[in-house]
Swiss-Prot record:
Keywords: Hydrolase. It is an enzyme of class 3 (hydrolase). GO terms for molecular function: endochitinase activity. Has endochitinase activity. This is Endochitinase. It comes from Glutamicibacter uratoxydans. Optimum temperature is 35 degrees Celsius.
């Protein structure tokens, strides 16, 4: 995803 927030509150940019 783009800009998806994860379970631990981290923002990913997969």
């Amino acid at each position: 995803a783009d800009g998806t927030i994860t379970f631990n509150g981290k923002v990913t940019d997969k």
